[in-house]
């Protein structure tokens, strides 16, 4: 089946948790089918933190052209909508050139938008985001859920009182536009990749295997320059609510630079945070990706 892939489909989509080996698989399949690799990870778009976000280096690219990696300054806002517009332009260009796009990354929402369209959500002012996230920290999710119940009872009924992120998102929309989030979710943009015309792969390694990779990877990141990356990032004095400032490893290494943590503690804390993130990713993939996604434990099985 894999040998005839390029003639039968319009794209390859590969997702999976961090450290699952999906990037190497993407390169291998792109090499085999004369394709290119397109990033679908929300952290790997930033021009900083190449090591901490495990952005592929030249030797790992295997001579395959890579797109949407490291092209966004760390202080610039970036959203799923922006990524989707960039991906759409690339897909159109590659189609004219007769080259196969191989999307790879761990941001599940990117794949949902790519194959199912994206609701036309409005941009939220940074000040509104900051204020509501501060309130979430200070008041807690249940208090904000009570406010959402009064302002948008329909959405509040669908959101758990403990789900702070979704509650804040719904309140952001109301405050920015005066309209409930549901009014935007009802309309969706165009589908960029027809899911019936794509080979869809999700890499789900066994937990002990994945955890071993994560532990080794974080220690290697420190040895390869992650501390210097964070030092340079902190020198930019970006607002703490910027996504790049929340990347796994940044808070831990920043604490070490302040003398608040040892290197050993940073490695342990960073690996633990990565394992938690991988757990959330795997839960999302299992719940959100349907049976048309090919589930594999070992990327080498597709060799």
Curated annotation (Swiss-Prot):
Its cofactor is Mg(2+). ATP binds at residues 16-23. Catalyzes the transfer of a dimethylallyl group onto the adenine at position 37 in tRNAs that read codons beginning with uridine, leading to the formation of N6-(dimethylallyl)adenosine (i(6)A). Substrate binds at residues 18-23. Transmembrane segments: none annotated. Monomer. It comes from Rhizobium meliloti (strain 1021) (Ensifer meliloti). It catalyses: adenosine(37) in tRNA + dimethylallyl diphosphate = N(6)-dimethylallyladenosine(37) in tRNA + diphosphate. PANTHER family: TRNA DIMETHYLALLYLTRANSFERASE. One of its GO terms (molecular function) is ATP binding. InterPro entries: Dimethylallyltransferase, IPT, P-loop_NTPase. Residues 141-161 are annotated as: Disordered. This is tRNA dimethylallyltransferase. Keywords: ATP-binding, Magnesium, Nucleotide-binding, Transferase, tRNA processing. Belongs to the IPP transferase family. GO terms for biological process: tRNA modification. Its EC number is 2.5.1.75. Pfam families: IPPT (PF01715). It is an enzyme of class 2 (transferase). The record marks 107, 129 as: Interaction with substrate tRNA.
